[in-house]
Design a protein with these regions (language model features):
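Conserved active-site tyrosine of GNAT-family acetyltransferases
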Residues: 110, 115
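Short hydrophobic clusters on alpha-helical segments that form packing/core surfaces
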Residues: 83-87, 106
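Conserved acyl-donor/pantetheine-binding loop and adjacent beta-alpha core of acyl/acetyltransferases
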Residues: 25-35, 46, 52-54, 119-147
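Conserved N-terminal entry element of GNAT/NAT acetyltransferase domains
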Residues: 1-9, 148, 153-154
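Acetyl-CoA-dependent GNAT
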Residues: 5-71, 77-80
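Conserved GNAT acetyl-CoA-binding A-motif
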Residues: 87-99
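Conserved beta-strand-loop-alpha-helix junction that forms the acyl-donor binding cleft
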Residues: 97-106, 122-129
Length: 154
């Protein structure tokens, strides 16, 4: 496995992954992001992307997307550690992210890695669906309704 910082040449491959989810935009807290506008960490194995973390730094570090295609190998944890190193080097005071109430794997994953719930935005997904109608309504048999903000102080 190789962890590398995303460069311009990676944008097409990353955009194709995101388009596979129905659209080439990522919506969080009512804001739209495009992969090519975000910094990131890519994980390659035998020339294939098996994980990625996209983030933006604006005083604090926001993890906009974290995805691994091979589970239970520590890839997501290692991506977070790489992003934490970058955030520290940029003097960020915290790392934060948004997930949904129905993403039960993420809810446990982030708490096990030291993140704390800092906000719950009730019914926020309705606003996000106005921007990106492709967002599903259900996940894990749970209505996708609320956005949950996690943070970690640096």
């Amino acid at each position: 496995m190789e962890f590398i910082e995303k460069v311009q040449n990676d944008n097409k491959a990353v955009s194709e992954i995101i388009k596979g989810w129905g659209s080439d935009i990522i919506v969080t807290r009512g804001k739209c992001y495009r992969a090519e506008d975000l910094d990131g960490i890519l994980v390659y194995d035998n020339g294939k992307i098996i994980g990625l973390g996209l983030y933006r730094i604006k005083r604090d570090c926001e993890i906009v997307l974290l995805e691994t295609f091979v589970q239970n190998k520590g890839i997501g944890t290692q991506i977070i550690e790489k992003i934490k190193e970058i955030a520290k080097s940029k003097n960020c005071k915290r790392i934060w992210l948004i997930t949904t109430n129905a993403n039960i794997n993420a809810l446990g994953f982030y708490q096990k890695r030291g993140f704390h719930i800092s906000n719950i935005y009730k019914n926020a997904m309705e606003k996000s669906r106005k921007i990106k109608p492709e967002i599903p309504r259900m996940e894990n048999g749970i209505e996708i309704r609320d956005e949950i903000e996690f943070e970690m102080e640096m």
